[in-house]
Amino acid sequence: MIPTTILISAALLSSALAGPWANICASKSSNEIRTCDSYGCGQYSAQRTQRHHPGVDVLCSDGSVVYAPFTGKIVGQEKPYRNKNAINDGIRLSGRGFCVKIFYIKPIKYKGSIKKGEKLGTLLPLQKIYPGIQSHVHVENCDSSDPTAYL
């Protein structure tokens, strides 16, 4: 028989290793980072044509519900591109010591409180703009540090 303290310790360690943020995408059971495809790789600091990737791409199917990774306030709209295309939308979320930009979503609102795991919005149609890409939610820390450990 396994002592209760060992079971509790194992559960706490497992939770800590999983990161403090909630699952971001309803179509995935965990926050899985996009691997490489013809458009590039989804991990933090992956090489791009003229720059490094400033965030992490979390796999998610087009049209899926996207959840708030932590409790906080949506403090405004964020747009990843200068042009108007079908996926040029997102938000800035701040709270619990975190600040992130989340791109490629149609948010339910651009300002206001939200709880961890609550519906934040819906993933926009990445396949329309980037056919064959692994559809994903882009998550970027406001200070440009690596968010991977929190996922």
UniProtKB/Swiss-Prot annotation:
Gene3D superfamilies: Glucose Permease (Domain IIA). Highly expressed in liver and weakly in testis. Not expressed in heart, brain, spleen, lung, skeletal muscle and kidney. Keywords: Chemotaxis, Disulfide bond, Metal-binding, Secreted, Signal, Zinc. Disulfide bonds join C25-C60, C36-C41, C99-C142. One of its GO terms (biological process) is negative regulation of Wnt signaling pathway. The keyword Aminoacyl-tRNA synthetase does not apply. GO terms for molecular function: identical protein binding; metal ion binding. It is found in: Secreted. Its main location: secreted. GO terms for cellular component: extracellular region. Zn(2+) binds at H53, D57, H138. The keyword ATP-binding does not apply. Has a neutrophil chemotactic activity. Also a positive regulator of chondrocyte proliferation. This is Leukocyte cell-derived chemotaxin-2. It comes from Mus musculus.
